[in-house]
Amino acid sequence: MTSKTTIVIGYVPTPVGEAALEAGLEEAKAHGDDVVLLNSPRRRSTVDGEFIDEATADELVARAAAVGVTARVDQSDHGDDIVETFTKVAAATSARLVVIGLRRRSPVGKLVTGSDAQRLLLDLDVPILAVKPPR
């Protein structure tokens, strides 16, 4: 019998984060993976709008359980570099996949992307599933 593998899902409480969550849970359910929901605040800022509280974390774990997926929330402090945090969490969990959400951008925005998503796509040594929320 093979051991379970892990998917790391980057989660923020936005439509982009929800798209990543849904895609990641689908993938985990299909392949029998565990999930780590990475919700990493900047330098432990508890006023960060992307930082989820304990009740929301519990709700996300329950949503995963409802579809048969074991999940936990990781709120590792990422300081100034979220890519490094993803790298560390992916390595620590031996992740087979990372799922991130992407914002829709204008044509000009696509040309001048200096985004964390682009850096993740270029720098992370784990397969990445990047999804957009529905229009």
Where are the language model's segments positioned?
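Small/aliphatic-rich secondary-structure junction motif
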Residues: 2-54, 67-69
